[in-house]
Amino acid sequence: MASYKVTLKTPDGDNVITVPDDEYILDVAEEEGLDLPYSCRAGACSTCAGKLVSGPAPDEDQSFLDDDQIQAGYILTCVAYPTGDCVIETHKEEALY
């Protein structure tokens, strides 16, 4: 099992967490005490949306996001597994629309 360094750029500053490749980014962020937005925890809404700044795109169920949003780098942290070290801007739900 691999683990990756995920930098979360929140309104309160940058936080670096280590996320195993078989755990959701949101779940590990919560375990580390970070307060990130979420609602459904199933990839069926956009409350937890983030935007990939750098690094490989996480492996996720992107069924809620449309092709343009995916191309723009948006992800849903509640259903995203890291595939490498990456930087993600959090709190991006409003930017989706």
UniProtKB/Swiss-Prot annotation:
Keywords per UniProt: 2Fe-2S, Electron transport, Iron, Iron-sulfur, Metal-binding, Transport
Name of a matching Pfam family: Fer2
Domain annotation 2Fe-2S ferredoxin-type: ranges: 4-94
CDD domains: fer2
Positions with a binding annotation for [2Fe-2S] cluster: C40, C45, C48, C78
Cofactor info, note text: Binds 1 [2Fe-2S] cluster.
Protein name: Ferredoxin-1
Native source organism of the sequence: Aphanothece sacrum
